[in-house]
Regions:
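Conserved N-terminal phosphate-binding loop of PLP-dependent enzymes in the Aspartate aminotransferase
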Residues: 1-136
Length: 136
């Protein structure tokens, strides 16, 4: 684990060594790993991909909302989305799992999506096809 935070001068002056931190959180190995992750995120345009694919996902989810009475909407941020139903989500989650799609419930009536950052539009298409299949 590793973390960082920024404090203005007023709060920084009030802190002493040991007030905030982790025993293992800032060692050289961990910081090297974090640095490498940031390099990969930049080199592979991961953030840009997330923005592009999340916009596509939202467009496709909007279509699902219009096409199925049991789907009342979706909510979330970027790729992290909840598909809001007006019926219990459990059977749909199980059906999606049976189709090889990893989702979970978030409360009784929400199917939660939390795809990897390297998701593609083709993955979204596959998900939407399987979602439509289980909703039918």
């Amino acid at each position: 684990p590793v973390g960082a935070f920024v404090a203005n001068a007023k709060f920084a002056k009030a802190m002493e060594p040991g007030d905030h931190g982790s025993t293992y959180g800032g060692n050289p190995l961990v910081t090297a790993a974090v640095s490498t992750v940031f390099d990969i995120l930049k080199k592979d345009s991961i953030v840009e991909n997330c923005k592009e694919v999340s916009e596509y996902l939202l467009e496709e989810l909007d279509k699902v909302v219009k096409d199925y009475d049991c789907v009342v909407g979706h909510r979330g941020l970027g790729l992290m989305q909840g598909i809001v139903l007006n019926v219990p989500a459990k059977k749909y989650v199980q059906a999606l799992l049976d189709e090889g799609v990893i989702v979970v419930t978030a409360g009784e009536k929400v199917i939660r999506l939390l795809p990897p950052l390297v998701i593609t539009k083709e993955h979204v298409d596959e998900f939407i096809t399987k979602l439509r299949k289980v909703l039918a």
